[in-house]
Amino acid sequence: MAYNLAKYIARRIKPYDKLINHEIKNSMEFKDIIDNIDIEEDEIVVNFDVSSLITNVPVNRALDIIYDCLESDSESNLRCQLDLYEVTKCLELCLRSTLFIFRGGLYRQEEDVAMDSPVSPIVANLFMHSLESSAVARSSPKVW
């Protein structure tokens, strides 16, 4: 049941992916961008790439970010019959339903987002976007 609910919620929050406009698709795209930039001696290149991003996203922060997206979207009710509170609670259920079997034992992942949920990639991308936006807001990058 949690998987089907996660698929439903994923379809509802997928439009927020459009908020992410600073994503480099591959190393060739990065090379093309960096080839056209003059980096001064007192400047640095920063990479926000994260290993194992999905399993390192804190659930509470992810819920806050999605809630903010939903709250600021005046058209979210057109995509979903659930209200803001209901969508958030369903998402929380999906993110906290992290049972898995290891060596015959049943375990629950205590923190962070599970890899196998349909909502996980969207939630991880929005979390990273929020983190990057916060970091960049405190500086004035030459390229972003």
Would you name each region that the model predicts?
Residues M1-N26:
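Non-catalytic interaction regions
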Residues E23, E29-D32, N36-W144:
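Conserved polymerase palm-domain catalytic core
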